[in-house]
Amino acid sequence: KRGFLDVVKHIGKAALGAVTHLINQGEQ
């Protein structure tokens, strides 16, 4: 189950990075 949590954390970081990237591009 620890592996599952690692996957969730990894997906969360990737999603957060993608959203931040889109917001930054939208502001430019």
From Swiss-Prot:
GO CC entries: extracellular region
Localisation: Secreted
Keywords of the record: Amidation, Amphibian defense peptide, Antibiotic, Antimicrobial, Cleavage on pair of basic residues, Fungicide, Hemagglutinin, Secreted
Keyword Secreted: yes
Major location (coarse): secreted
One GO-annotated biological process of the protein: defense response to bacterium
Tissue occurrence: Expressed by the skin glands.
Modified residues (Glutamine amide): 25
Positions annotated as propeptide: 27-28
Domain of life: Eukaryota
Task performed by this protein: Has antimicrobial activity against Gram-negative bacterium E.coli (MIC=13.32 uM), against Gram-positive bacterium S.aureus (MIC=13.32 uM) and against fungus C.albicans (MIC=13.32 uM). At higher concentrations also has a bactericidal and fungicidal effect. Has hemagglutinating activity against horse erythrocytes.
Family to which the UniProt record says this protein belongs: Belongs to the frog skin active peptide (FSAP) family. Cruzioseptin subfamily.
Listed name of the protein: Cruzioseptin-3
Organism: Cruziohyla calcarifer (Splendid leaf frog)
